[in-house]
Amino acid sequence: MKKTITLLAMSLLAMSCCGEIVKTEVDVIPQPAEVAVYEGELDVAGASFKADKELGEMALKAIDKFEGQLVAASTKESGSAKAQFVFKTDKNLACEEYSIDVCCNKVVVKASGLNGVLYAIETIKQMLPEQIYTGAAACCEEWELPYMKIQDRPRFSYRGMHLDVSRHFFDMDEVKKYLDIMAIHKLNVFHWHLTDDQGWRLEMKTYPELTQVGAVRKQTLIGHGGRSRKYDGIPYGEGLYYTQEDVKEIIAYAAERGIEVIPEIDLPGHMLAALATFPELGCTGGPYDVWGRWGIADDVLCVGKESTMVFLENVLAEVAELFPSEYVHIGGDECPKVRWETCPHCQAKIAELGYKDDEKYKAEHYLQGYVTSRMEKFLAEKGKKLIGWDEILEGEIAPNATVMSWRGVEGGHEAAKLGHDAIMTPYTHLYLDYYQSKDVENEPFGIGGYLPVEIVYSFEPFTDDMTEEEKSHILGVQANLWTEYIPTNEHLEYMLLPRMSALSEIQWCQPENKIYERFLDNMDNMAEIYDILGYNYAKHIFND
């Protein structure tokens, strides 16, 4: 059936211009769904622009920006050539779908709104000289687009990238740069990991102490956590957090690029920054320190105390108010139960709820399920959906929770079988703090492992034994960038690129369009974009 639809689509493409199709691929990442390239080119230097106002204010702003870049880079005033860009509204297209038709003297772009317009512009920009990204004059370059027809849409609706800003903080300009890189690759979800044992990075009006105390650790571990107990002796984190005005600015910046921002408040584990601020939230009463090392701490929130649950609800209420995203991520990963096993408050709550050990889980796992379910219900009252790492499957999963599957694909598949939505982000393929080369002595520091571009690119979220119903619950794919060993933006970009390019084709392309050799050829063009934008990137695939 899919083959029939594709053949029909290609037939329609062939009818859109005179002549025969000469290519069915373009030098674009991610590769568009359906492409037909014909003989002939259109010089678009100095082209005029016309746009349908129904596309919306943000889409029109994006079109104006593109026009300005083209005028500046091609060194011709708008309207000095015969070519014209025409942006039209087509409500029959899905929100992220678009079409491009280059024929005669026109480039006709159709979309139903902002995201389709953004993706069409990005596709066009990648086919023009790289100076289009900076507006730098490039008078000697050829500003030609081939006669072509593109019909494009993403495979997955959720195309995410995560950033941990707790272990190491990245300022506003660096976060915006991260969003810019995402936009080039047509990613649409920024997962912002704002709290962890090593620092609380989000201003809370209800609890201002969380960034006064919880943002600052006394010192930081030198080297790998399992091999070293040496510390640098330097306090880290004073003033390193985002104000709520900062957050609003980032959300607006992301929205202009078609990106949704999902906040993560990791609970009930990974909470030493909060425990150091409010020791009464813990099982032992402390004292606690904002952690200066990496790994998993035994000290977690005392969820047997109602006061702890009220604290969590107050925090999440403020987060839900601040972030317009339909989702809030509550973590739920790596929460040791050792403190709960001996805590009178937690044991009393277990008894009250009637939890008991069984052949699959201990009672304490069900206690965490109680926390997740309560937070899910609370967030639902605020109009939000809950996401958690795949540990939330242990015990009783909250009724409407979305599972982020990081320990492999099994958690996502289990969630889908249970009728829950899932997002695939397995460490085996999508943890970008892993090394990109086996020659680790000559690589920037990583957490370990080996994850070159080829392995990233090879990831497929579906398995042959999945039913169509189960597949429908897989919302998409995300890569994660944990920053224990990534203290600078230069290091961050190196770990991110070019692996994000590989990620984008997993997220966007149908399996039949995912061809590694074609991808490598297209990466030469992408490297020119990286270079002109000044990005620091790993060059292994270009040296092979």
Residue ranges and their predicted role:
Residues 274-280, 284, 289-401, 406-418:
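Active-site neighborhood of glycoside hydrolase catalytic domains
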Residues 63-75, 186-187, 381-383, 418-422, ...:
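Structural alpha-beta junctions
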Residues 1-25:
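Bacterial Sec-dependent N-terminal signal peptides
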Residues 93-299, 303-309, 314-327, 374, ...:
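Feature activates predominantly on carbohydrate-active enzymes
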Residues 385-401, 406-544:
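Flexible, acidic glycine-rich loops studded with aromatic residues
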Residues 58, 169-171, 197-203, 268-274, ...:
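Flexible loop/turn segments at secondary-structure boundaries
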Residues 45-51, 159-164, 233, 295-301, ...:
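Glycine- and acidic
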Residues 17-157, 380-393, 397, 524-534, ...:
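Acidic, contiguous N-terminal accessory segments
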